[in-house]
């Protein structure tokens, strides 16, 4: 086990090192000099509230680590292949990607890097690669400002960190956000008590905080103090998550130590099966969780979050580090009851490229050297990262992080993402976290085009200053995009923002003038990575006209199973089933489809039609909760031909199990119901409803659209 203590700064080659019996030498770990073994400080003051680590992303990426103070030349770029989460459907696309160039590399092995001082001192040569008997772990003193990263005297002068860390790793399969995570085997207990390891100082609890493609995050407790921490456990047996990659992450954490807006690494350990990264435990949850749960946010709260993230990015960018996976899941809140302050976490995909001040300082270049491997989460990827992923480009710079911040800010202010992917497949599961190559490609095209809108219905109440900042963050060209310094100096962050309600999914529906209705964020679906589910299952080329409505029949609740109940709970009818939806929509578009007309007997209620008011027909409208249910006002349509049939406008069936009542430019304004006719039908419907109620409680949107 390697620890950094508060001893003097002399090099390790001139200092005696105390190690466990199985380790009698030392190793240069990512630029850190090994120190004496032993816990020498108490972490009881660390943590202090904060957000639990959640949904860890550890997608494969080409490690890029530089420990010098100079930029590497642009020709040092690696292949534009990397890991992004999109899904099994993305694997086919990945297989068709072609590399534009590939460089020969020399692999750096631990046993090959030996200093002359090591050989002359008579100390055994460290050979940890491929040996199960070696047990290596380490710890850092986080409060010693004098302890800096240094290199061993004997670390080969001709070798660079690029040689050490530049390891080609396989491309990870693209998964939709929130989908396809793999479970990591539970960490085994300590087998040899004579070795000091993670379980000598900490014990795991049953509280699981999150998981990712290659690891999991769990709560652990210090055996000495009882203080809780979050431990990231990474399975070292995986093919793509190498030891060198972990060391790079540890090194970047060390560089970012003590920053108030970056989660702190406290310990790290390694045994024969896993890596253990012990970090401060945050208790406020990820920012995404707050967006989903809170009903009211203000521009002031959004401003504070933006400022905190910008401060973290400025700190990292000034040190040549790009985060490359900025998203709401990786922004952790310190307080469960407040959205700010926040801390940036998960540096697994970060890439370190310190600026070359002597040649061209950061402030004097429009675009910094490329970061090569495209990584991150799809909805938050900058256009240049998408270009690198699809092979249209071989480089992008640290401004990819400020684009991602722009997407987050847009979401905080509007409640949905500026860019979404969609397709025409009825059975597409993209919105539920399942892979869909068509949706993925559509999303990429939209991001590459860089086109987005500020719909008046949601953005009319948002200040022009906030919109201006979003516009400058979502610039297609990185040269024109704001950097962290420009963000922090923007007038919206320099003043106290107006107390405007943050339009999140919970409160969008309460606005009477809202045309782009709720994007219900439900944990019932795996939407922790997908902020905007706006795939339309019904589109119309021309705007429909409203028919005259008769008397108000009250408020009805639409259930996900298609049943329709009146306010009193009495069964009123059912919607057509899912299979008829596609045909109905397509034929209705072309004018070839006429919905079946049900004539009611004098003893039964007349057919009813669901209508939305005229002012809601200009933009997409969506009503949906966790089980696709919603609450609306019912009206009995006026009959234009003297009978009780529904005549105008033409109506189509709605895909109840997935999407209800949307359109683009032209809104579906009517849905025909099948009225009840017989006692047998009523009994059958009631039986079905009772069965559904016993199986799953019905969730409802608690407001209605008033015509």
Curated annotation (Swiss-Prot):
Among the entry's GO cellular component annotations, what is one?
Answer: nucleus
What is the documented disruption phenotype for this protein? RNAi-mediated knockdown causes a reduction in lifespan but not in a glp-4 bn2 mutant background. In an ife-2 ok306 mutant background, partially reduces the lifespan increase. In a rfl-1 or198 mutant background, partially rescues embryonic viability by restoring normal cytokinesis.
Tell me the ranges covered by the Protein kinase domain, including all copies: 203-493
For this protein, the record's SMART domains field holds: S_TKc
Which residue windows does the record flag with biased composition (Polar residues)?
1-24
Q: Does the keyword Zinc apply?
A: no
Tissues/organs with expression: Expressed in pharynx, intestine, vulva and body wall muscles.
Ranges where the record places region Disordered: 1-29, 101-131, 589-628, 688-707
Q: Which GO terms describe its biological process?
A: behavioral response to nicotine; determination of adult lifespan; intracellular signal transduction; regulation of protein deneddylation
Q: Where, by residue number, is the active site? A: 325
- State the Gene Ontology terms under molecular function: ATP binding; calcium-dependent protein serine/threonine kinase activity; calcium/calmodulin-dependent protein kinase activity; calmodulin binding; metal ion binding; protein serine kinase activity
Function, as annotated, reads: Serine/threonine-protein kinase which is required in the germline to positively regulate lifespan. May play a role in body wall muscle contraction. May be involved in embryonic cytokinesis.
Q: What is this protein called?
A: MAP kinase-interacting serine/threonine-protein kinase mnk-1
């Amino acid at each position: 086990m390697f620890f950094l203590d508060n001893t003097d700064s002399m090099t390790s080659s001139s200092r005696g090192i105390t190690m466990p019996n199985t380790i009698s030498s030392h190793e240069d770990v990512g630029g850190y000099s090994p120190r004496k073994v032993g816990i020498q400080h108490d972490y009881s003051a660390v943590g202090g509230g904060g957000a639990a680590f959640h949904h860890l992303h550890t997608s494969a990426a080409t490690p890029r680590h530089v420990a010098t103070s100079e930029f590497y030349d642009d020709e040092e770029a690696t292949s534009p292949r990397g890991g992004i989460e999109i899904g099994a459907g993305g694997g086919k696309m990945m297989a068709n990607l072609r590399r534009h160039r590939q460089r020969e590399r020399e692999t750096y092995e631990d046993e090959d890097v030996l200093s002359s001082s090591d050989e002359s001192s008579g100390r055994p040569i460290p050979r940890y690669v491929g040996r199960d008997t070696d047990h290596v772990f380490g710890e850092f003193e986080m409060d010693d400002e004098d302890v800096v990263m240094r290199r061993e005297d004997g670390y080969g002068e001709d070798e660079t960190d690029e040689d050490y860390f530049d390891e080609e790793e396989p491309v990870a399969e693209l998964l939709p956000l929130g989908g396809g995570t793999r479970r990591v085997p539970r960490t085994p207990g300590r087998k040899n008590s004579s070795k000091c390891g993670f379980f000598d100082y900490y014990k795991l609890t049953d509280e699981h905080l999150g998981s990712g493609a290659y690891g999991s995050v769990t709560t652990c407790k210090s055996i000495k103090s009882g203080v809780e921490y979050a431990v990231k456990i990474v399975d070292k047996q995986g093919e793509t998550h190498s030891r060198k990659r972990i060391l790079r992450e540890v090194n970047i954490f060390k560089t970012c130590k003590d920053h108030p807006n970056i989660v702190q690494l406290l310990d790290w350990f390694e045994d024969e099966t896993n890596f253990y990264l012990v970090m401060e435990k945050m208790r406020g949850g990820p920012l995404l969780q707050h967006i989903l749960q809170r009903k009211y946010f203000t521009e002031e709260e959004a401003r504070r979050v933006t400022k905190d993230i910008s401060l973290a990015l400025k700190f990292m960018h000034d040190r040549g580090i790009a985060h490359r996976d900025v998203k709401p899941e990786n922004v952790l809140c310190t307080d469960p009851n407040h959205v700010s302050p926040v801390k940036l976490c998960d540096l697994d995909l970060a890439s370190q490229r310190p600026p070359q001040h002597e040649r061209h300082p950061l402030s004097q270049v429009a675009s910094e050297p490329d970061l090569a491997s495209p990584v991150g989460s799809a909805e938050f990827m900058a256009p240049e990262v998408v270009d690198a992923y699809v092979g249209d480009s071989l480089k992008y710079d640290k401004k990819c992080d400020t684009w991602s911040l722009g997407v987050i800010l847009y979401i905080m202010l509007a409640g949905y993402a500026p860019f979404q992917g969609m397709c025409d497949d009825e059975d597409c599961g993209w919105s539920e976290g399942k892979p869909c190559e068509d949706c993925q490609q559509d999303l990429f095209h939209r991001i590459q085009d860089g086109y987005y809108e500020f719909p008046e219905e949601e953005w009319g109440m948002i200040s022009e200053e906030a919109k201006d900042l979003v516009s400058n963050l979502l610039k297609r060209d990185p040269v024109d995009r704001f950097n962290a310094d420009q963000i922090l100096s923007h007038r919206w962050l320099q003043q106290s923002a107006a107390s405007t309600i943050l339009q999140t999914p919970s409160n969008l529906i309460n606005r009477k003038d809202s045309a782009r209705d709720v994007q219900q964020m439900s944990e019932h679906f795996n939407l922790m990575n997908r902020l905007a589910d706006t795939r339309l299952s019904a589109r119309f080329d021309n705007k429909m006209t409203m028919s005259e409505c008769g008397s108000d029949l009250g408020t009805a609740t639409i259930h996900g199973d298609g049943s329709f109940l009146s306010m009193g709970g009495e069964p009123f009818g059912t919607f057509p089933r899912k299979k008829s939806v596609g045909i109905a929509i397509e034929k209705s578009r072309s004018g070839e489809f006429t919905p079946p007309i049900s004539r009611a007997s004098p003893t039964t209620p007349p057919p009813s039609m669901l209508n939305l008011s005229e002012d809601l027909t200009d933009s997409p409208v969506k009503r949906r909760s966790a089980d696709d249910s919603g609450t609306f006002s019912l009206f009995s349509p006026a009959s234009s031909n003297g009978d009780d049939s529904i005549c105008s406008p033409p109506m189509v069936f709605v895909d109840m199990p997935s999407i209800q009542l949307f359109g683009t430019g032209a809104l579906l304004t009517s849905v025909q119901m099948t009225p009840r006719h017989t006692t047998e039908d009523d009994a059958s419907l009631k039986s079905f409803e009772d069965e559904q109620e016993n199986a799953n409680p019905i969730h409802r949107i608690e407001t209605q659209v008033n015509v």
